[in-house]
């Protein structure tokens, strides 16, 4: 089964949009799962987006294509705030699709511009728009922005310059641009995920956990218009307004270090400059108008995207997420990346010669006159300056010794050890085993790694659904973390933050109730031994002495499984 539809033992895996997991899956060509194969798939996706921007540039225009390629290579790093990370950290790119979502959003529009420039089949953009809707559920709006820009460009600007001629087929194609992403979104996020949510609720799962999107939009707009709201929305109004103010602060002030050039206003200024140069460079009035419309509409959509984020922080996210603007950076740079990519697409087309054909009549003879207009060569220099500037700035922040290139093989020892241990453990398991993960002191990353390292053997979510009797709030507990009796919870630190306080009976019920057949003791500590030793037939003696990592779930308790444990 594919990663996208497999039951990975997590509550969300079956609902994740399958675009990126499928991409990762199809690059696992030979052998077992490996992290680097995911990166290969992502890199090919990135380069396909870059090709969409420079694909229309002919070979003789290498003075444009080469520096433009350098600019594109910088984009995924230039507009993110991870450029100061100096320590190796595991990144599972199947879970963070924000950069790919932004690239595909901009790449779809760039591909459309290249298709029109070369009079290629226009329908080829429809699968790209569909893909853009299948990367992340919360970036579906970016797919709609791309579809809207393509649709407006097609509908307003006829190929022959006659608006009325071919209006009906242009209208049909414009509607198809919206239909492609909306069909994918409806089939997956509405029909399929809706079915899973309803099934979860009927099976005593969490069901629907957030306010309906339509109601969020309506009540949020009412607040902006000064109209009164009631109930839940009145309670969250202050949170909504605070989130908007904080987002504005991040955009305008130096506190918002979201890119290599600082806060959001600097990014928008750079994108505006690229659009302005593209308009000036365009050799025909028609192309100038097309670029101006795309630039203006994408700017309006940027405001709408910010409104969507504010509504999410105000009415969908929990209060602490709104107070801290949790993950704001990766939500907003999806738009920045896509916006910059489509601006570069406009610039690439603007730097190409434009041919206009006018028809007339000389008596009974039809006469067509073709005019070829060349852009000014000086505008090509702008691309070179932009490339040099971005490469210089990136070189300042991402020094070779602070990148993957600067780390010795020994830095990857821990990751290799994790993979080796997973392979060893899996060799003692049956294909239908379900593993309960015990990793004391884990913040969730170890459990998350194990989910993929053990596949196709399932690693359980290792938790349960609980409902607060006072507030009625439903939440998942598990996915790694510190397990122990409620009274043994540490006062501070990682173990306190990720503490799951279960009695021995509760833990036993969770393990058996979730259908787990094996416990994987990745890391032990005194809290776990003191809390749950009586559940194990050997009081955890084998695990403490390093004789085993696995315990089989039996009627008599959790029994140690004999295995050869590496001493390394």
Regions found by a protein language model. Name each.
Residues 142-178, 460-464:
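Perimembrane helix-loop-helix junctions
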Residues 1-23, 32-33:
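Extracytoplasmic catalytic/substrate-binding loops of multi-pass membrane glycan-assembly enzymes
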Residues 122-137, 141-148:
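Membrane-interface alpha helices of multi-pass inner-membrane proteins
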Residues 196, 200, 207, 381-448, ...:
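Membrane-embedded, lumen/periplasm-facing catalytic core of multi-pass transferases
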Residues 94-105, 135, 141-142, 319-349:
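Hydrophobic/aromatic-rich transmembrane helices and adjacent perimembrane loops
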Residues 26-29, 167-280:
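Membrane-lumen/periplasm interface segments of specific transmembrane helices
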């Amino acid at each position: 089964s594919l990663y996208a539809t497999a039951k990975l033992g997590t509550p969300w895996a079956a609902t994740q949009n399958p675009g990126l997991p499928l991409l990762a899956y199809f690059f696992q060509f030979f052998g077992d799962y490996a992290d680097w194969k995911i990166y290969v798939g992502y890199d090919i996706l990135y380069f396909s987006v870059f090709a969409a921007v420079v694909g229309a540039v002919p070979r003789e225009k290498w003075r444009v294509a080469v520096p433009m390629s350098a600019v594109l290579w910088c984009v995924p790093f230039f507009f993110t705030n991870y450029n100061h990370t100096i320590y190796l950290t595991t990144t599972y790119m199947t879970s963070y699709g924000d950069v790919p979502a932004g690239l595909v959003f901009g790449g779809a529009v760039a591909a459309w511009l290249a298709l029109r420039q070369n009079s290629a089949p226009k329908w080829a953009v429809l699968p790209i728009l569909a893909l853009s809707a299948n990367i992340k559920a919360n970036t579906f709006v970016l797919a709609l922005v791309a579809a809207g820009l393509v649709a407006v460009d097609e509908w307003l600007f006829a190929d022959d310059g006659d608006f009325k001629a071919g209006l009906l087929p242009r209208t049909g194609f414009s509607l198809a641009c919206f239909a492609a992403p909306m069909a994918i979104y409806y089939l997956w996020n509405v029909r399929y995920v809706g079915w899973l949510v309803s099934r979860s609720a009927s099976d005593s799962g969490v069901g629907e956990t957030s306010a309906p999107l339509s109601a969020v939009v309506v009540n949020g707009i009412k607040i902006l218009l000064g109209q009164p709201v009631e109930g839940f929305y009145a309670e969250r109004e202050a949170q909504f307004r605070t989130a908007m103010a904080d987002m504005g602060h991040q955009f305008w002030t130096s506190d918002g270090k979201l890119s290599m050039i600082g806060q959001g206003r600097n990014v928008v200024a750079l994108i505006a400059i690229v659009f302005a140069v593209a308009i000036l460079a365009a050799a025909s009035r028609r192309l100038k108008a097309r670029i101006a419309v795309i630039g203006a509409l994408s700017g309006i959509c940027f405001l709408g995207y910010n409104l969507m984020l504010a509504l999410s922080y105000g009415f969908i996210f929990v209060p602490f997420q709104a107070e801290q603007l949790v993950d704001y950076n990766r939500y907003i740079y999806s738009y920045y990346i896509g916006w910059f990519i489509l601006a570069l697409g406009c610039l690439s087309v603007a730097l190409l010669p434009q041919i206009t054909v006018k028809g007339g009549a000389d008596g009974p003879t039809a006469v067509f006159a073709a005019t070829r207009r060349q852009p000014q060569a000086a505008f090509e220099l702008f691309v070179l300056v932009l490339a040099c500037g971005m490469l210089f700035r990136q070189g300042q922040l991402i020094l070779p010794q602070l990148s993957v290139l600067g780390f010795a093989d020994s830095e990857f020892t821990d990751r290799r050890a994790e993979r080796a241990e997973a392979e060893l453990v899996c060799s003692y398991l049956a294909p239908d085993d379900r593993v309960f993960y015990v990793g004391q002191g884990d913040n969730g990353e170890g459990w998350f790694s194990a989910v993929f390292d053990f596949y196709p053997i399932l690693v359980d979510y290792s938790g349960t659904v609980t409902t607060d009797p006072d507030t009625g709030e439903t939440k998942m507990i598990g996915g790694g973390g510190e397990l122990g009796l409620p009274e043994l919870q540490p006062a501070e630190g990682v173990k306190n933050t990720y503490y799951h306080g279960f009695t021995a009976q509760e833990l036993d019920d969770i393990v058996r109730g979730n259908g787990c057949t094996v416990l994987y003791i990745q890391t032990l500590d005194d809290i776990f031994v003191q809390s749950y030793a009586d559940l194990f037939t050997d009081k955890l003696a084998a695990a403490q002495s390093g004789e085993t990592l696995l315990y089989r779930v039996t009627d008599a308790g959790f029994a140690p499984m004999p295995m050869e444990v590496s001493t390394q």
